[in-house]
A protein has these predicted regions:
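AAA+ ATPase "lid" subdomain C-terminal helix
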Residues: 1-9, 74-79
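Peripheral, non-AAA+ core regions of ATP-driven protein-machinery
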Residues: 14, 18-19, 27-48, 54-72, ...
């Protein structure tokens, strides 16, 4: 008899299901192989340097003791806020003022304004008038390789000079920022958020800020200002009251 070839077709749904199942199996196999090559690493303070290398920037910290002629200011940089230590030395001479630390023109002007202000209030602080003709003054900002400019270090320089000529130490845990005028007014500055963060990182307890920056302080998140005693000042008299260990 005649044989007939019988062909049975596989339903399309069944073929698609089989292909999907194969795909899932391949995905599981790939995931298993990937997991076998994956190592879980926990990074903490103990091994952070091993993975990221040495720190690029050293964290500045406040001094251990109150000192004469040394005041911590606050600065804004292109990579955030920073603290700025200003040092003033008084030595025998004839009234010369030496400015070092790569100060820009605006900062040099601020230093001269600060000096003029301190001279104008010398009698109030019982400073002998001839000190400005028989002594030289050296104002220095460390990290001399880094250029520095701007008027916001005015109050810091004025405080450092005042401390140096009176012999009154400055609280080590106080930092400040603000432009100063010849009459001792404290003018507003910019970059306040970054400066406050820098102060907090350095361990500063009290920050002196121009009163006209009050609105900027109000806009800061609580986690930034928490733990800081922020004082609003409008005159150098107030700055001296808060910064000097004993105000005259």
């Amino acid at each position: 008899g005649e044989e007939r070839l019988r062909v049975e077709s596989v339903p399309q749904e069944s073929a698609e299901a089989e292909t999907e199942q194969e795909g899932k199996q391949e995905a599981k196999q790939f995931e298993a192989e990937r997991n076998a090559l994956t190592t879980t690493v926990t990074i903490d303070s103990g091994n952070l340097e091993a993975y990221l290398g040495k720190p690029k920037y050293m964290q500045d910290r406040i001094a251990d003791r109150d000192e004469v002629g040394i005041v911590r200011g606050l600065a804004w940089t292109s990579v955030g806020g920073d603290t700025l230590q200003i040092e003033v030395n008084v030595m025998p001479g004839d009234g010369e003022i030496d400015l070092t630390g790569q100060m820009g023109d605006v900062m040099k002007e601020s230093a001269r304004i600060a000096m003029s202000y301190v001279r104008s209030v010398s009698e109030r602080y019982q400073v002998a008038a001839d000190i400005y003709t028989t002594r030289d003054f050296h104002i220095h900002i460390p990290e001399g390789a880094v250029p520095k400019d701007g008027p916001s270090a005015g109050v810091t320089m004025a405080t450092a000079i005042l401390s140096a000529v009176t012999g009154i130490p400055v609280h080590a845990d106080v930092a400040m920022t603000g432009e100063v005028t010849l009459r001792g007014r404290v003018l507003p500055i910019g970059g306040l958020k970054e400066k406050i963060l820098a102060a907090k990182t350095a361990g500063v307890k009290t920050v002196l800020v121009p009163k006209e920056n009050a609105k900027d302080i109000a806009e800061l998140e609580e986690e930034i200002t928490e733990g800081l005693d922020i004082r609003l000042v409008e005159s150098m008299e107030q700055v001296a009251e808060y910064a000097l260990v004993r105000s005259a």
